[in-house]
Amino acid sequence: MKLHNVLKNNNKEDVVSNIEQFGGNADWFNAARVLSESLPYIQQFSGETFIIKYGGAAMKDRKLAENFAHDIVLLKQLGINPIVVHGGGSKINEFLEKINKKSTFVNGLRVTDAETLEIVEMVLCGLVNKDITQLINKAGGNAIGLCGKDANLIEAKKVCYTYKENQSNNVEKILDMGFVGEPHEVNTDLLFFMEESDFIPVIAPVCSGENDLTYNVNADLVAGALANALAAAKLIILTNVPGVTDVNGNLLSEISVSNAESLIEQGIANAGMIPKLQTCIKVVKEGYGSAHIIDGRIPHVLLLELFTIHGTGTMVLNTDI
């Protein structure tokens, strides 16, 4: 029996079995099939800009970090323009513990005093950012490490929260978050230049604001601001969980803006998931592209999400589901 006769068989399992009889490997067949199936997605996304927020387990696990770097280089080679925005909360915690300093979080944001800000800037801009750029360059890319301060890339404004100390009255108090900011303005010139080049921007979320003050800005918020400013086709946020879950803990593969807002209001989405959902909501409301929250613990999760029919995590949509 000739191999070309085997390939006429419409049963995929039989084809794989018979290929092995001819000295082949089922993994080869599956790899070729996946490459073939990815063609429509590659054609669709070529020339588009993707904002990818990188953090969590994908950053802490060295093998996952190397996989991520290779995937970013592959996207660039396929004609896609990836822009990486990274966090680094666990590494910041590690350094704060060395000086016996604890952090307080409000709605997923770290209250940042002057001492904490020094640690944040040192860790994000000096350690984490350079490690990511090195991994991408080692994988064959041309990554450039930046932060929001560089070329006035991202200007921030101070964040303040209001809250009611006593629910029985309407008196609101202001919580000073310290040097915590939110994106106010994005200078797109540098990033548009990089879109036309071989460079891959890797951005740390440390930004400047009024009176030359430095602000610690949540990486999810920075990623969202860049997605809106650049009219990116996709915002993809890697995290430590499978995606957004409902009140019973079930994964939601798709969620509307209104349902996402309800999860926040009801306290079902909490802690670090709040800025992630808020960012996705804002991006899809602008109508520029789609927003995804995916599980960074899965090897090559970016490729699975983008180039196969087996999407992962949660997609936030500006429609009712």
From Swiss-Prot:
The keyword ATP-binding applies. The record marks K53, K276 as: Transition state stabilizer. Pfam families: AA_kinase (PF00696). GO terms for molecular function: acetylglutamate kinase activity; ATP binding; L-glutamate N-acetyltransferase activity. It catalyses: N-acetyl-L-glutamate + ATP = N-acetyl-L-glutamyl 5-phosphate + ADP. Signal peptide: none annotated. It is found in: Cytoplasm. This is Acetylglutamate kinase. The gene is argB.
